[in-house]
Structures are given as structure tokens and as C-alpha cells.
């Protein structure tokens, strides 16, 4: 059944003024018009990768706050909450923190849940139930074609169909610079893997090797070259492969004089050196900047190792500020190298170049998330042997290599197409769009 009550309806003139003063594209402007006029207590905005959802949400915040509403941002992870706040200006926190703190809301509250496709059913239900009791509005934002949620599963997909909401979608890719790549990602997102793969193949973006050693050597070499033209990230389907790639990257940087392993130190079972790029893997509010100001470390932060001393591990933030992590944080294994990340860890990250390495990550949602992280170029690396082995393990109906002529590129394509891992719930249908 649909949501029967109305909430968050604004004067169309107020919305028009806010849109006119913004730099929104037509699809973004339409989304704001629908969200502020439809009146559904629960609304859904599908924001595919690279379409500028946080920019659009910034205008949504502006128009609602001008009308006297309080806008709250929520996301499954601290990093996603931080990026939502930075991109939209909406004060944001994690869903878990919001539920624990039981923040007071009322009928003049709008709750924006970003990355809703990664949130569990129980968490989303709790947010909606609380909002419904007081008359607040909830806006679920996400993409049902990206990686599935890690909780109970299916909340966002179910909302697309069962909540009776006005579904709006951002459709213009504002991230990738090449038109062919924008088209290929859209094809991949909608399941047309054959056409998408052909485009990457045609533009020389697919690298197949005979064995894993050749694969990793080629990928690391290409990664080193691409680093000179922008921020470059390797992505893997498993933590084991990401770990191996990180070790190879560190050795290459040491060989080229870019990392001084003579001054490396061991802490928490891992070794680090000044200049190492690392990811912080747990929220930890009780840390401090070098000037003594308190600082909250958030899961997923990418930082650079500066030094280690008796006070802790000194790291450099992207802002240029330094944070001193207490030694116990690193000793618990909450710091890891970040030249290569798993695809799940990279969801929400944007960089210049992406190298997707190994067929373990080549299920459809995973490869879409990985390739859509890059602004300038994205590459696919796999060995023909790995692809064949994976095909044999899964009941795909593909003849074994002993039964037919082997085409490694076709095997890779079939692997991508047949190994979609999205855990759709029984409500997992396509959204009903409102134009």
C-alpha cells in the first residue's frame, strides 16, 4: 500500500527561485521539484554513479531550510555521511549513531538517507517508523544497480515498489569525461554487459594475461604510470588480492625511491613507512590534531603516514592537517595499506584512474561500482585461466574448455554477465518513474 499522508509540500514559487539560483541540470531540477511537491512521507531518489546527487541534495536542503524545516542527513558509513555533509551542506551522521541517540524530530523535519541501498531493512524501517509517528519526511537516496546492502537486505529495492513513492532519477553522468564510457556504464548498469564490455575492449581498456604473475606485474606497472597523471586506485574483489597488490605496490615504490623502507616500522601486525598511503578502518572519535584539537577518525578515511613516535602514529589528511592516532588504534589492526582497496571499501570513492584487477570482482554490480569510480579512465585486468576456473565453479551452462574452443574474452564477458550478486528481495522490481 502507498503512503497515505502528505509531508513536506512547499510553495512551488519558493522551489522555482531556489532552482533558478542554482547550477542544477534539468534532471536534478526535476528531482527537486517532485520531492518538494509530491507530499509523500517517504520519497525515493535514484542517483546513479556520477550524476551529482549531493549537489542536488544541497539545493533540496536550501529550499527546505528556507521554509523552516530541519534537514538531517544519514548514511550507513561514516565516510558516506561525511561526503554527504561535505557535498550538500546537510549535517549528517551514521544511521547507527542516529538510532542509538534517538534524536528528536517533528513534522518540520526532513531526513535524507544517502546510500540507502547499503542500509539494512531493520535500520531503514526504524527510521521510517519514527518519522511516520511524528509526521516527518524521509528521502531515500541510492542506486539499486550498485552493490547490495550488508544488513538484512532489500530495503531500498522494496521501497521503490511497495512504499508507493514518487521515484525520481538523476540520469545525466557528470563524472566520466568520455561519452563512450558514460554510455558503456549505463549499459552495464542496466544489464547489457555484452555491449558495455565490447566498448571497453574496443577502446583498449581490457587487459588479459596468461597467469596471475603476469597480471599483477602488468597491473602494478600500469598503476605506476597512471599515477603521474592523477589519483589512481587499484580495486580488487577480495581482501587477499588487495593485500597482495598493496605489497607489490609498496615494493615498486621502494625500488623507485618513492618509499623508504629503511625507516619502516611494524605495528598491529603490519609494516608501514613514512609516505605510505593507508585507509583507516574504524570510527574513533577520541583522536587529536597536531595542535591538540579533538578529531573524530571515520571509517574509510584515506590518509598518508608521516611518522610514528611514543605519542602514536602521525598521519596527513587530505586537507593538509595532521592527526595523531594513538598506538592502540593501529595495534588493533584498524589501519591498512590503500594503494589497492576492495570494491566494497571503494563504494563512494571518486578518483582519476581505476584498475579493476582479478575476476573475483567481476560480478555485474561490482564491476559497475568499480568502473564508475574513475573520472578519466577505468581498466579491467584478468587472466584467462582464472576466468575459466570461475566459470567451471558456477552453474552457468557454459561448456568446459575441453568441450569447445576457448575464447578468453568471451569467458570474461560471460563471467561478468552471469555472476550478478545482487540479493534482490521479493519486492525487488524496477522503480516507477515520475517525470
Residue ranges and their predicted role:
Residues 91-99, 135, 139, 253-261, ...:
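Short hydrophobic/aromatic-enriched beta-strand-loop microsegments
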Residues 41-201:
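ASCE P-loop NTPase helicase motor core
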Residues 89, 128-130, 248-252, 294, ...:
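Short, solvent-exposed amphipathic alpha-helical segments in soluble enzyme
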Residues 81-82, 148, 241-243, 386-391:
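Short, charged/polar "capping" segments at the starts of alpha-helices
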Residues 44-46, 74, 110-114, 139, ...:
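Structural motif
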Residues 2-87, 246, 309, 314, ...:
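Conserved helicase NTPase catalytic core signature
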Residues 190, 291-292, 298-435:
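C-terminal accessory regions
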Residues 1-18, 30-34, 43, 51, ...:
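Conserved helicase motor core of P-loop NTPases
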Amino acid at each position: 500500500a502507498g503512503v497515505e499522508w502528505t509531508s513536506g509540500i512547499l510553495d512551488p514559487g519558493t522551489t522555482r527561485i531556489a532552482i533558478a539560483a542554482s547550477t542544477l541540470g534539468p534532471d536534478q531540477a526535476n528531482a527537486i521539484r517532485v520531492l518538494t511537491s509530491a507530499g509523500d512521507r517517504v520519497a525515493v531518489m535514484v542517483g546513479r554513479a556520477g550524476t551529482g546527487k549531493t549537489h542536488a541534495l544541497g539545493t533540496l536542503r536550501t529550499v527546505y531550510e528556507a521554509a523552516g524545516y530541519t534537514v538531517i542527513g544519514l548514511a550507513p558509513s561514516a565516510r558516506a555521511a561525511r561526503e554527504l555533509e561535505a557535498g550538500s551542506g546537510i549535517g549528517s551522521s551514521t544511521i547507527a549513531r542516529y538510532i542509538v541517540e534517538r534524536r528528536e524530530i517533528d513534522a518540520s523535519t526532513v531526513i535524507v538517507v544517502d546510500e540507502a541501498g547499503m542500509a539494512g531493512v531493520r535500520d531503514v524501517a526504524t527510521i521510517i517508523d519514527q518519522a511516520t509517528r511524528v509526521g516527518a519526511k524521509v528521502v531515500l537516496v541510492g542506486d539499486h544497480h550498485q552493490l547490495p546492502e550488508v544488513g538484512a537486505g532489500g530495503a531500498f529495492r522494496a521501497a521503490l515498489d511497495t512504499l508507493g513513492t514518487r521515484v525520481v532519477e538523476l540520469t545525466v553522468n557528470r563524472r566520466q569525461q568520455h561519452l563512450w564510457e558514460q554510455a558503456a556504464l549505463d549499459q552495464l548498469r542496466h544489464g547489457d554487459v555484452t555491449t558495455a564490455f565490447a566498448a571497453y575492449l574496443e577502446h583498449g581498456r581490457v587487459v588479459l594475461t596468461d597467469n596471475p604473475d603476469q597480471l599483477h606485474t602488468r597491473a602494478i606497472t600500469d598503476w605506476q604510470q597512471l599515477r603521474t597523471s592523477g589519483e589512481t586506485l587499484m580495486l580488487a574483489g577480495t581482501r587477499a588480492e588487495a593485500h597482495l597488490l598493496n605489497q607489490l605496490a609498496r615494493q615498486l615504490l621502494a625500488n623507485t625511491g618513492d618509499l623508504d623502507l629503511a625507516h619502516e616500522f611494524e605495528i598491529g601486525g603490519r609494516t608501514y613507512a613514512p609516505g605510505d598511503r593507508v585507509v583507516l578502518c574504524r570510527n574513533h572519535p577520541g583522536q587529536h590534531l597536531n595542535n591538540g584539537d579533538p578529531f573524530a577518525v571515520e571509517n574509510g578515511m584515506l590518509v598518508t603516514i608521516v611518522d610514528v613516535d611514543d605519542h602514536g602514529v602521525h598521519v596527513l589528511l587530505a586537507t593538509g592537517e595532521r592527526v595523531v592516532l594513538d598506538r592502540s588504534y593501529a595495534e588493533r589492526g584498524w589501519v591498512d595499506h590503500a594503494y589497492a582497496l576492495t570494491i566494497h571499501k571503494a563504494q563512494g570513492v571518486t578518483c582519476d584512474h581505476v584498475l579493476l584487477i582479478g575476476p573475483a570482482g567481476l560480478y555485474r554490480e561490482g564491476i559497475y561500482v568499480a568502473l564508475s569510480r574513475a573520472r578519466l579512465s577505468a581498466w579491467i585486468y584478468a587472466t584467462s585461466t582464472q576466468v575459466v576456473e570461475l566459470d567451471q565453479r558456477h552453474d552457468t551452462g557454459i561448456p568446459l574448455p575441453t568441450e569447445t574452443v576457448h575464447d578468453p574474452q568471451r569467458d570474461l564477458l560471460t563471467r561478468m554477465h552471469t555472476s550478478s550478486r545482487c540479493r534482490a528481495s521479493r519486492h525487488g522490481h524496477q522503480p516507477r518513474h515520475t517525470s
